[in-house]
Amino acid sequence: MATGRIQFAVSTPCNTKGKPSGYRLFEFKNDRLALVPSERGCTKVDVNANIQAFCYLRPNGRDTSISPDATHILDSCDYMVLAKSNGFIEIISNYQYKIKNGLRLAPSYILRCTPEDFESNFFSDYMIAGLEYSQGLLYCCMCSGRIYVFVMNLPTDYIQYKNMYNPMFPDCFFKVHHDNNTTHSSEEEKLFEGSTRYTGRSCSKHICYFLLPIEPSHLRSSPVVSSFCNMYQGLPIYRPSMYLHIERGISTFHINPLDRFCFMTVSPRSPLFIRKIILPLTYVTFLSTFISLKNSIQGDTCGEILSWDNVAQQNGFGSLFSWISNKFTFDTDIINSTIWDDIVKYSGTGMLDSGIVWKQRQGHAKDDIYELFHTQDMLGSSRRNSSFSTASSEPRPLSRRRRESFQALTRDAFRERMDVPCSTKWELDSFIRGLRRNTFMVDFEIVEKISHRNGNDGVNEDDNTTDESDETMTSFLTDNYKKMDIVCIDHFVTLSAFRPRYYDEPIIKIDSLSNKNGSENGTNEEEWAESQMKVDGQVIDDETAQFKQALGNLCSFKKLFMLDDSLCFILDTHGVLLINRFEIKNTKNLLRNSKDTIRIIPHDFGLINDTIVIINDIDVGTDNVCALTFHLVVTSMAGEITVLKGEFFKNCRLGRIKLCDSLKLNRKDRFVDKLALIDYDGLNAQKRRLDYDEKDLYTFIVKKVKRD
């Protein structure tokens, strides 16, 4: 049975200097992958700049339609947001309408990430860790730790489309309840909420209505911006509403679904953080004053005021900020504060701080890494081996011992015992803490625990009867956080789950160190497998052996998708893993769990860049056992875009997957990188045929890849 239409975008960076990068649109239908012809905007802006992140916005539960020029209340058009390595963010409105009608996909609005990052060189590239939208705030988080926040003028039902489509279990992700959010909001946040409510649509009240354009004099004086502003054909370039700077090396970023002023970050050698933006009254007062001033001056007049300093001078003030400061002279504390000085210095961008409200406890848990180094046999072997060499028993500097230990740590070290010569307990524990900090997270998802679950969720006490007076609980993590779980995967094939409301350590952790080698008690495992064979026959034994082999081949987790609050869909370079985390009874030996708890599909994906998951069908039985059918869209370092169809069956540890279609780049100076899901019709979508001219396909230069 053919699947519904899947439409997605793929970024195509170019590694040749002086040539443009960009992105392409593809459609998968009737088991065929085809290029969607589209006309892009000016390609000069893509020279020496590539797309780092997509963010596709559309109303939730409503059909999209083109926005008319006349004034109307509700916005129904969709927006594609493209964040580029040169620090510019393009917003394309009426995106699907333009695709269907063959219109140019030129940006309608331009954002600029400023202050610029000049730490590495003058024309520094922006490495983006995350581009996300939630409840009117667009976050752009750089790997350098710089976070730019833009206040968008959108209705409350607008959401960001994720790279997963799963209509079967929509209740495992937090819904936005504005009443609950304002209950625990500060006075500054309530004032911010009242000042930035959706205004309706007109020719002037667009998506960037709350943003301040960069002054033309600043555009001319900035060498980075001035080289691009002419290419955007006179479009206003808007500056961020807020800016903050955290530690460097951010690898993953997500907005807290319970609080739009709160976000979560992960970086190598650092734990998982939940941070809260500190919103000062000075900045909120400035923003609300500017918006009210804009309402009175601009009104419903078409066109954007490009220079507010010129308007201020026409009204007898030296600049916009002297005009605004004149409106709240009754409060001299605002004008005399350092926050106001920063607002003036950075031309209307608030330089804000953030506070850590929760932090993962890292480096002290007695997990499999701890047990690996603290077994008596290993320590005894170390003492015996030290007697064969007088040099090994001589005192040596601590730094040398640690250096040699780290150099000896290879992938084979996880499969055999290691020699730690003459290490005392505190030295060994210090080494283990350093090792564990290197097993950093590569991806994490936030889900809401469904209360009717009966499985093992990692919490012994009832959530409703927990003593709220516990001094160890963070006051910020209110009752709304009782059902929040953060599920994580790290580079060394480990799955962890946190419940920040109660713990700073994982409530469940599946470590590959013991499972790759089978179990700590090999004899018991063989006896157990033999008993299973006697009961169920030889077929089950073969499946168990194949399952063990496939599990041992896993080497690097890449992507995590939560199908519901328990089902973890993990993509590894050597297969697909489906874990029902609430049903796991034995984390030390995965074979001792039921067949439907942990399932795997062996497949060699190669070096994965990005993935889209489409869940076609889920059949859940009364015992919470499910059969699953899905489609995968994968981009790889080999320059391929691959679409595969996979299945997981009931009462079977092994699934199967097959190649549907694949396209590969012929050009050696380009590769395929980021993906963005745009549309999916579903299995009962109306069938229609799209014809493409060969001249449209020539612009991408692709070839079919045939496989057995």
From Swiss-Prot:
Residues 381-396 have a biased composition (Low complexity). GO terms for biological process: actin cortical patch assembly; regulation of protein-containing complex assembly. Residues 381-403 are annotated as: Disordered. Disruption phenotype: Causes a decrease in the number of actin patches and concomitant accumulation of upstream components like coat patches. Regulator of the GID E3 ligase complex. Modulates both assembly of the substrate receptor GID4 into the GID E3 ligase complex and its activity toward its substrates. GID12-binding remodels the N-degron binding pocket in the GID(SR4) complex, and could limit substrate accessibility of a bulky substrate to a ubiquitynation active site, thereby stabilizing gluconeogenic enzyme substrates. Involved in actin patch formation. Present with 339 molecules/cell in log phase SD medium. Interacts with core components of the GID/CTLH ubiquitin ligase complex. GID12 binds both the substrate receptor GID4 and the tip of GID5 in the scaffolding module, sealing GID4 onto the scaffold. This is GID complex associated protein 12. It comes from Saccharomyces cerevisiae (strain ATCC 204508 / S288c) (Baker's yeast). The lineage of its organism: Eukaryota, Fungi, Dikarya, Ascomycota, Saccharomycotina. The gene is GID12.
